[in-house]
Amino acid sequence: LGMFSNLAKPAAGDWARWRGPDLNGISSETGWQAKWPDDGPKRLWKARVGTGFSSVSVANGKVYTLGNSGRGRGDEKDTVFCFDAATGKQIWSHAYEARLDPKYYAGGPSGTPTVDGDRVYTLGKRGQLLCLGATDGRVVWQKNVATETKAKSPTWGFAGSPLVIDNTLFVNVGARGTALDKKTGKILWSTGRESSS
């Protein structure tokens, strides 16, 4: 994970979920440097987060992401990381058991954390859904949403990123769309088939 000078300026808007504030992957920021030096922008910091394909979310001066510590030794864990956006100092991390599961790729988590106010939501490859405190990483609630909805895992595991609209948290697990109360984790409804491709 590396942060570059144009991405970590205090004036920059938050990017608190996958594809940004408008869910279109387009930044509304202005004044971006159109031409970079041959060796690229100045790196402000970098951090080791393990294996995975999670993007980063930026909110309130903090950067959140996921990675897996596994090397096929049987002690694999997914970890949610929170860093100071300006310095790269790790503020907190929360780890839970999760297989690396390298199937046709390196493995690790694929979903991006979603920050909503003082909460961070993450979805792991096997359906582990977590709600953590954004400032301290404490577990507010957690559940395996795939188990509870009887969703079957796709070949590469679940890769969706949570979406918050008002008081509802939406996740995609396989062929199921599921809505939960964002404060309690209670499942409000779930749709779809029990199998996924």
What residue ranges belong to the model's regions?
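Noncatalytic, solvent-exposed loop/strand surfaces
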Residues: 1-197
